[in-house]
Design a protein with these regions (language model features):
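Active-site neighborhood of divalent metal-dependent phosphoester bond hydrolases
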Residues: 107-111, 119-144
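Conserved beta-strand hairpin/beta-sheet module of binuclear metal-dependent hydrolase folds
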Residues: 2-81, 171-175, 181, 205-216
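Acidic/glycine-enriched edge-of-secondary-structure segments
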Residues: 52, 57-59, 81-89, 209-215, ...
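Active-site-proximal loop/helix segment associated with metal-binding centers of metalloenzymes
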Residues: 52, 152-242, 246-247
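Binuclear metal-ion centers of metallo-dependent hydrolases, dominated by the metallo-beta-lactamase
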Residues: 1, 8-14, 135-137, 141-148, ...
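Short, well-ordered alpha-helices that flank and scaffold nucleotide-derived cofactor binding pockets
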Residues: 98-101, 125, 267
């Protein structure tokens, strides 16, 4: 079972998702990989996505209104208000202009797009070029995040970027659920008295943050052993891309390309007790 409160059913569902995203019920067009949108229920969250190495990665959590990487902008991702880009390889970021343009055409609110801070200027230039070609606003809010930097998404949700290890600048994201909990010394007081304390400037609650979702994007397994990434392993759901799953490619082959081999995940998990 996965560490951090994840159930055996959740682990089984993860295996199902990994298998499902590599198959399709229909015959693909010549020269294109087979892919269908997959839906699962894990730890109380509905998860939808497409992931084919080198072609497209996009994973959404509809109840949280967020999408990790945008792939080729599959239609199911357009409705999500928050987009988190892990790195700039085309199979992860290629659909970004279309995502923003489609939301604008549908008169949806401008999305908030999070990118590694080192990519922010390049992304701005990308949109400048597309605005010139498309003659449209392509309105969105771009938020550059450094590793370890945090951002409050909503009253109840917060994101933190964490370090990953790919062949280009990259990072993952942890989504935290934020709750206000009444301090023990004020428990049992009448509501009116609590209200008066608030009005007088007294802080009567503590903020509690729980890691709910973590997404790695493309990376080597080193991120699992990074001591700064402890919350990543505590998340209820950790989405990890394992590009190589059999002996047709070695662990060394995977590392050379900045990816994870499934065998390495298993070995690392045994060392860290990520799964037990």
């Amino acid at each position: 079972m996965a560490k951090g409160g994840q159930s055996a059913a959740s682990s089984a569902a993860e295996a199902e998702l990994a298998a499902a995203t590599s198959t399709s019920a229909s015959t693909p067009a010549p020269g294109r990989p087979r892919a269908t949108q997959q839906r699962l229920e894990i730890e109380g969250y509905r998860v939808e996505g497409i992931s084919i190495a080198g072609h497209e990665t996009c994973v959404i959590f509809p109840s949280l209104n967020l999408v990790f990487d945008i792939g080729r902008c599959p239609p199911f991702a357009v409705s999500q208000d928050f987009l988190f880009v892990s790195h700039a390889h085309m199979d992860h970021i290629g659909g970004l202009p279309m995502y923003v343009a489609t939301r604008g055409r549908k008169r949806m609110r401008p999305p908030t797009v999070f990118v590694p801070a080192c990519l922010a200027d390049l992304v701005r230039r990308l949109f400048d070029v597309h605005r010139a070609m498309d003659q449209s606003d392509l309105d969105h809010k771009l938020v550059p995040l450094e590793v370890e930097e945090e951002y409050q998404l909503t009253k109840d949700l917060r994101v933190r970027a964490f370090r990953t290890y790919h062949v280009v600048p990259s990072q993952g994201y942890v989504i935290y659920k934020v709750k206000q909990k009444l301090k023990d010394q004020y428990a049992g007081l009448p509501g009116k008295e609590l209200s008066n304390l608030r009005k007088s400037g007294v802080e009567i609650t503590n903020v509690e943050s729980t890691p709910e979702i973590a997404f790695s994007g493309d990376t080597m397994s080193d991120f699992i052993l990074d001591p700064d990434n402890a919350d990543v392993l505590k998340a209820k759901i950790l989405v990890v891309e394992s590009t190589f799953i059999d002996d047709s490619k070695s662990i060394e082959d995977a590392r050379e390309k900045g990816h994870i081999h499934l065998l390495r995940v298993c070995l690392t998990s045994l060392k860290t007790k990520l799964f037990y």
